[in-house]
Amino acid sequence: MKTNPLRSLLIFPFLLCSHVNAEDRVAMKVLNVQKIWDAAPHNAFTDLERFNGRWYCAFREGKGHAGGGDYGKLRVIHSEDGKDWKSAALLETKGVDLRDAKLSITPSGKLLLNSCEYRVDNDNADIRNNTSVTYISSNGTDWKGPTQIADKGYWLWQTTWQAGIGYALGYRWGHRDATKLYQTKDGSEYAQLVNHLRPPGDRSNEHAMFFDDEGRAHMLLRRDNATSKQAGLALLGQSEAPYTDWEWRRLNVTIGGPSIIQIPDGRIIACVRRYAAENHRDWGSQWTEIGWINPATATYTPSTKLPSGGDSSYAGLVWHNGLLWISYYSSHNGKTSIYLAKVSIPG
């Protein structure tokens, strides 16, 4: 979620201004969708940011979604107007799969990119061989990094800033799964804030987060727990500063690739991957959509399906000039490519 001014007040716990509950009946309208990149065999896992008056989109280029010998690289592209895009940088590390670029702006005004070095040729079901890293740039073109961060084996997903401090969930995958909440002042050094943010065995992983006007943290958390349908439902979390004590509630859907944003009138929008019959493994049953999050009832209400299908999702969300701008990837036209959508949100 990207920084937005003029957020409406949220009342603890999970109570919104009265007008927010009406959003379940309001459909968001996709005004325009444009393919903005397809140079690699597989282009995926996006994020979007406005930095120094330009648009920046970051994503992975690889042979496929993942796999042995697929050493992904991170492409950063930029645009003045959101229509014409050019490459700004290509980040790569020999022998590793660089995955899931996530963008944010540090308190010092630099562009931060979170990623993970996934050693695909030296992996096992016990602990994935991951190293979380960051890159930092003053101009979006020249990048310093990679800088290794967090604990070895923990995939630190993305950084969200509040009052000069960045917060990020890190997760360890495999049979010894675990989660930690980290904090940073500069995007180069991260310290553990909370150990076991979720219980071991919960299979929590990807997250998205925003802070409301009162400084409360709100987190949308994916779970891949196959022990039961309820165990695989996404979670909504909330915490007051200093963000060491969290309250969790089950959402009503299973999701992948979570993104979340609070728009200026206080309403909360999520962009997620959905699964027909909740089947994570069937690419043919998947798509990317936007919908409403109601914290008062811990519910997600679908609104609009983006043009998408198959290997798809992992959106970046930015509110700009009264519209929601969404970067995402999809395979609905054959080749897995990067798309940019502009969406209007009725009042």
Specify the residue positions occupied by each region the protein language model found:
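C-terminal structured domain segments
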Residues: 310-316
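Beta-rich carbohydrate-recognition and catalytic domains
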Residues: 23-44, 50-97, 105-257, 261-310, ...
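Bacterial N-terminal signal peptides
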Residues: 8-17
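Short glycine-centered, acidic/aromatic-flanked micro-motifs in structured strand/loop junctions
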Residues: 101
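Sec/Tat signal peptide C-region and signal peptidase I cleavage site
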Residues: 19-21
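Bacterial N-terminal signal peptides that target proteins for export
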Residues: 1-9
